[in-house]
């Protein structure tokens, strides 16, 4: 029986659900006929209004003492988030397999995943902000490529352990995936459900010990196929439980935006060293002028395009150029760097919501070359909408 696709979503020759970007709003009168529309173009007036809104909510900045608190106690804010929401806040990301087929390397097509779950209706926003939670006591204004494993054992230190290329969790696997910022498993468990290849192994880590505890107590967690651990992406002294040049895929889904911009480059460069030559790094995150950015109020801005939510967690809004700089400075090559401009619709309340996400795929060269370190543009760079909107 042929697959049934929603109106406006064309079926491809092989019957697969197409990637995002195939449902266009040609008639504004039909805006409430679907829940989402792809590649929605902004008018010059709308882009200018978004830029004005960001300029307005970018000052005053959160005072220095509160900024230090949000950085030093970042893990506590995420622990609190997961204690409150447990595993009920984010939906399982079944749409990832359509956008990133590297996560299901043995599948030429998806089976058993309903179309509505494959559809990338992404919503990853934290709770809203309240000015009261940010008051300061100070006076300051506030392609799927796989390379055979290396034959020579690689020895590294992992915290207090010494591991070799032949003795680490999942060392016998031939295809290894690491998700950074895994939360309670909304990406990991769909990957494990979709892949029944015994030679595939998944690693997953999160800043929050509470999130990892919840993930490990989930009935779907299988230590023979998955290794979950607590890890601070920004801590240069912490090691990963795998040697360099050992991973096929690294996944970053709405996680890089949660760390201080000045620490992003070192984090990506460190992750890059874990990839095999030919391995890929996959990212989906917030784009500049996303609805979530425009909704922030005065007093919640930490620095240019970097904000704190009401629960103390933080979020940065990227441009394509910033992400390209991060990845290429880490020695990776661009495969994909796309803006997903989505118009989401609440048909019940007759509301329209303009979303901006960026989706990237960068690969590690097969022929390794020495690369110079290029610093990330400072977070206070101009919030020009050129190249994004």
Swiss-Prot record:
Residues 1-20 are annotated as: Disordered. Its EC number is 2.1.1.-. It is an enzyme of class 2 (transferase). S-adenosyl-L-methionine binds at residues 78, 82, 181, 206, 232-233, 253. Its main location: cytoplasm. Keywords: Cytoplasm, Methyltransferase, S-adenosyl-L-methionine, Transferase, tRNA processing. It catalyses: cytidine(32) in tRNA(Thr) + S-adenosyl-L-methionine = N(3)-methylcytidine(32) in tRNA(Thr) + S-adenosyl-L-homocysteine + H(+); cytidine(32) in tRNA(Arg)(CCU) + S-adenosyl-L-methionine = N(3)-methylcytidine(32) in tRNA(Arg)(CCU) + S-adenosyl-L-homocysteine + H(+). Signal peptide: none annotated. Pfam families: Methyltransf_12 (PF08242). S-adenosyl-L-methionine-dependent methyltransferase that mediates N(3)-methylcytidine modification of residue 32 of the tRNA anticodon loop of tRNA(Thr)(UGU) and tRNA(Arg)(CCU). N(3)-methylcytidine methylation by METTL2 requires the N6-threonylcarbamoylation of tRNA (t6A37) by the EKC/KEOPS complex as prerequisite. Belongs to the methyltransferase superfamily. METL family. This is tRNA N(3)-cytidine methyltransferase METTL2. It comes from Mus musculus.
């Amino acid at each position: 029986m042929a697959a049934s696709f929603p109106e406006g979503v064309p079926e491809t020759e092989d019957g697969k659900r197409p990637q995002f970007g195939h449902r266009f709003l040609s008639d504004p009168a039909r805006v409430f006929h679907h829940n989402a529309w792809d590649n929605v173009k902004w008018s010059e007036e709308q882009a200018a209004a978004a830029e004005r809104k960001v300029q307005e909510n970018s000052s005053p900045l959160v005072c220095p003492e509160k900024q230090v608190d949000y950085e030093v106690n970042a893990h506590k804010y995420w622990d609190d988030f997961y204690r409150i929401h447990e595993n009920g806040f984010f939906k399982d990301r079944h749409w990832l397999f359509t956008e990133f087929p590297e996560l299901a390397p043995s599948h030429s097509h998806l089976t058993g995943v309903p179309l509505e779950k494959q559809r990338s209706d992404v919503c990853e926003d934290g709770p809203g902000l309240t000015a009261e939670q940010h008051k300061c006591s100070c006076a300051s204004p506030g392609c799927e490529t796989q390379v055979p494993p290396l034959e020579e054992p690689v020895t590294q230190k992992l915290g207090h352990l010494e591991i070799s290329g032949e003795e680490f969790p999942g060392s016998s696997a031939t295809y290894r995936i690491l998700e950074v910022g895994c939360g309670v498993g909304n990406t990991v468990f769909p990957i494990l459900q979709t892949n029944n290849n015994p030679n595939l192994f998944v690693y997953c880590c999160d800043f929050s010990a509470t999130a990892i505890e919840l993930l490990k107590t989930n009935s779907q967690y299988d230590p023979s196929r998955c290794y979950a651990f607590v890890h601070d992406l920004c801590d240069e002294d912490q090691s990963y439980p795998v040697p360099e040049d050992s991973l096929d895929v690294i996944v970053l889904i709405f996680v890089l935006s949660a760390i201080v911009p000045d620490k992003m480059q070192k984090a990506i460069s460190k992750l890059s060293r874990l990839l095999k030559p030919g391995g890929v790094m996959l990212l989906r995150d917030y784009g500049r002028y996303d609805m979530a950015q425009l909704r922030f109020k005065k007093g919640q801005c930490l620095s240019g395009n970097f904000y704190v939510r009401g629960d103390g967690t933080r979020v940065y809004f990227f441009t394509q150029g910033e992400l390209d700089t991060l990845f290429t400075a880490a020695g990776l090559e661009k495969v994909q760097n796309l803006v997903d401009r989505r118009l989401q619709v609440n048909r019940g309340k007759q509301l329209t919501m303009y979303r901006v996400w960026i989706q990237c795929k960068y690969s590690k060269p097969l022929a390794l070359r020495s690369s110079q370190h290029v610093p990330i543009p400072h977070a206070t760079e101009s919030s020009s909408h050129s190249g994004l909107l």
